[in-house]
Every structure is written in C-alpha cells, then in structure tokens.
Amino acid sequence: MHEIFYTGCGKVGNTLATHLDRKGHEVLLYDINEEVVKKINEGIHPYVEGIRFKNVKATTDLNQINEFKNLICALPVQVIPKVITKVNLKGKNFISASKGIIHENLKRISQLVKEIEPKLKFFVLSGPSFAEEVSKGLPTAIVLAYEDKEEAMKLQDALDSENFNVYLNDDITGVELGGALKNVIAIAVGLSDGMGYGYNARSAIITRGLHEMANVGEKFGARRETFFGLSGAGDLILTSTSDLSRNRTFGKLLGQGYSVEEALKKINQTVEGVKTAEALYEIIKRENIFAPICEGVYRIIKGEDPKKVYPHFLSNHLREEFQR
C-alpha cells in the first residue's frame, strides 16, 4: 500500500485516484474548489456517475503534501508554476500527469520542477488514457518515464493492474513532448474533419504530425523511437480520432466556422493544445524545425482563415518523406 498526494481534482486527477483506490492505496487529492473537495470526502466521484471512493480524501490545504513522498501532479500546465512554488518538494517523487509546454518560458514541466528542487526524482505518466474509460476500469496501457529505475519499478508495481498496464521508459524528454505535442496535431485533425476533408486527409495529418513531433523531440535530445510508442503515436491516435478529445473537438469547431473564442466557450474546459501551439511556434522558429502542421495550427489560433492555412498543412516543398 502506497500513500499518494495528488494535486488537481479535475478529470485526470480523479481518474487516477479511482484506479489507485481500487488497488488499495491511500490517496489525498488537493484542489481549491471546496464543492469538489466536499464531494470527494463524501466518497463521490465528482465527474463519473456511479463511482464511489473508499480510500480517497481531498483537501484545500496544500501544506499536507509534506506528509507524502509520492506527488502526482495533474494540474493544467499553465497553472503549475503558480502552485508548485508554494510546496516543499525536497525528497519527493514528482510524477507529472500533465501534458503541455509552459507558455511563458517555453519550458517543459521537468525543467521547471528540477530548477525548483534539483534533487527530487522526476517521473512522467503519459499515454492514451481517456479519463472516463480508466475510471470505469476499461483496458488501458500507459508509460511511466523515469530517471531513477529503482523508484520507477516501485511506482510501476503500485500503478500496474490487469486493466491498467504500465510500461517503463527512460526517455523523460520524449515522453513529455509526446504528450504535449499530440494535442496540437489533434487540433489539426479535428479542423480537417470539421471542414469535411475526409479520411485520407485525417490519416495524412496524423502521420505527418507524428513526424513533426519526432523532429521536435530529436532537437531536444529525445529518442525518435519514443514517439512511436504509447506516449507518442498511441496518445496521438486516441486524441485525434475520438470526439471525447477536447483538442480534436476544438479543432473540429474551428473547421465548422466557430471562432477560437466561441469554440473555447462551447467546450468550457481547458484545451491544452492552444497554449502548447503558441509555445511550440516559438520553439520551431527558434530551432528552425520544418513543422507546417504545428505552424498552421498556431496561425489559425491567432486568427488566420483556416481555409487559407489548411493547404499548407501537407505542403511538402518537394521533400523526401523522412527528411528532417
């Protein structure tokens, strides 16, 4: 039995809490929303009807983190810098379940956290895992990226179950970037579907988008093969093809003629791909990376006409297929 502190009582936070609860671990969730905290303490899952908690509690007191070794962070990426500086991370296992790039400074979560507390042990939990399906105990496979294999094996044992398979990977950068960048490509796929461009176009954007993700990853020392695993191709396929995906839905609404503001209002939840696209645009320009899909999503988010930008998504500039 492990004791795990969890920041973020959104869908992802409650989903993993549900899974950990089934495995008999004690979980304490942190959130600022008192109504959500109250529901959890009454044993009620705040987002999935019919699911009850046994060993999960919640608090609005962030200082209670000091009692726990294992910290899972499932906060929206842009919120993390404000929260993480308020806690003592010394001696912690920090497991990031958030997917994105910090817009203000273009940093990955691992970079931010390690700057605050260099000696903590950092992990990334990522892969194709829609919250509702995990909460219901449906079969899922994800990856845990690590810098300390001994601790990673302990966490793998704590998380793994018959219907929740956890693989290990020592490429933290690749797993982090895969989880973040696939949201941008999913917006592009949704846009294409919203404009009615068919399955050929969808398949092309997913495939070429994966190539762009791997190109960005390699620039930062990630292994290319990581992007063809669960945190890359696996998560990209799921997020790009299911209407449960907020990023795909956002893109689809843009393709149907909604403005950025209208689409975000209609979804009424965090769409991580929007801020990630803005951060990613700065990165691909700075590093001179050929990434027309990622660049196109940024241009559309900034107000350009999707019908004029879309043709550039698959513009090959007469390149070889696997040219970097």
UniProtKB/Swiss-Prot annotation:
Which GO terms fall under molecular function for this chain's record?
A: glycerol-3-phosphate dehydrogenase [NAD(P)+] activity; NAD binding
Which keywords describe this protein according to UniProt? Answer: Cytoplasm, Lipid biosynthesis, Lipid metabolism, NAD, NADP, Nucleotide-binding, Oxidoreductase, Phospholipid biosynthesis, Phospholipid metabolism
What Gene Ontology terms for biological process does this UniProt record contain?
Answer: carbohydrate metabolic process; glycerol-3-phosphate biosynthetic process; glycerol-3-phosphate catabolic process; glycerol-3-phosphate metabolic process; glycerophospholipid metabolic process; phospholipid biosynthetic process
Q: Which reaction does it catalyse?
A: sn-glycerol 3-phosphate + NAD(+) = dihydroxyacetone phosphate + NADH + H(+); sn-glycerol 3-phosphate + NADP(+) = dihydroxyacetone phosphate + NADPH + H(+)
Residues that hold sn-glycerol 3-phosphate according to the record: 99, 127, 129, 182, 235, 245-247
Q: Where in the cell is it found?
A: Cytoplasm
Q: What is its main location?
A: cytoplasm
Which Enzyme Commission numbers does its entry carry? 1.1.1.94
Gene3D superfamilies under this entry?
N-(1-d-carboxylethyl)-l-norvaline Dehydrogenase, domain 2 (1.10.1040.10), NAD(P)-binding Rossmann-like Domain (3.40.50.720)
What domain of life? Bacteria
PROSITE patterns per record: NAD_G3PDH
Q: Which residues form the active site?
A: 182 (proton acceptor)
Pathway(s) of this molecule: Membrane lipid metabolism; glycerophospholipid metabolism
InterPro entries, per this entry? 6-PGluconate_DH-like_C_sf, 6PGD_dom2, G3P_DH_NAD-dep, G3P_DH_NAD-dep_C, G3P_DH_NAD-dep_N, NAD(P)-bd_dom_sf
GO CC, sorted alphabetically, is: cytosol
- Residues recorded as binding NADPH, renumbered to this chain, are 99, 131, 246, 272
From which residue to which does the signal peptide run? none
Q: Kindly give the HAMAP family that the UniProt entry links to this protein.
A: NAD_Glyc3P_dehydrog
Q: What does this protein do?
A: Catalyzes the reduction of the glycolytic intermediate dihydroxyacetone phosphate (DHAP) to sn-glycerol 3-phosphate (G3P), the key precursor for phospholipid synthesis.
Similarity comment = Belongs to the NAD-dependent glycerol-3-phosphate dehydrogenase family.
Give the protein's recorded name.
Glycerol-3-phosphate dehydrogenase [NAD(P)+]
Name its species.
Aquifex aeolicus (strain VF5)
